[in-house]
Amino acid sequence: LDIFTVLESSRIDGYVDELYPGVMKMYEMVRLAALESRPDVTDLPAREALVEFMIRVSLGQVDEMIVPSEHKDAARKLRRLIRQVTSTDAIVEDAAEAAIRAYSILIDVKNDELEDDDYEELEDDEEDSDDSGDDEDVVDPEEVIQQFMGMAAPDGDGEGEQEDGSDEQDFEG
């Protein structure tokens, strides 16, 4: 799953939860079944473990949330993003913005293999759900895009770039 899909699914789930409470019993059964089929977080490298954490939050898990110890702050920020998009006031653009923010958090996490003792439980902090609006969470979408563009070509072949470093392309049509 990609990050946007997790966030947009969470947004829709929040909408369904609020506006259609009659379907929630069956919905919860499906969520629980989905959680049971998820991989063990401690079997995953750091970044993948945080993505799995996001999936689990989106499926409604609150207890026994295991995350890489070194990245508990990142996990809290990711959980806050998911909780913010579950508001019935949230729109698809909010999920898209949250995805950019999530990517900016995850891009700084190396996907290193970890030992079992490098993980610990993250408590359910209800203050994550309020709109604390930490300024440190504000990201420049252009900066995130540039970070991804830099990661896209790790072999550095520079294909498609002009000698002056620009990425100008000629389109005919």
Residue ranges of model-derived segments:
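Short, functionally important secondary-structure microenvironments
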Residues: 1-173
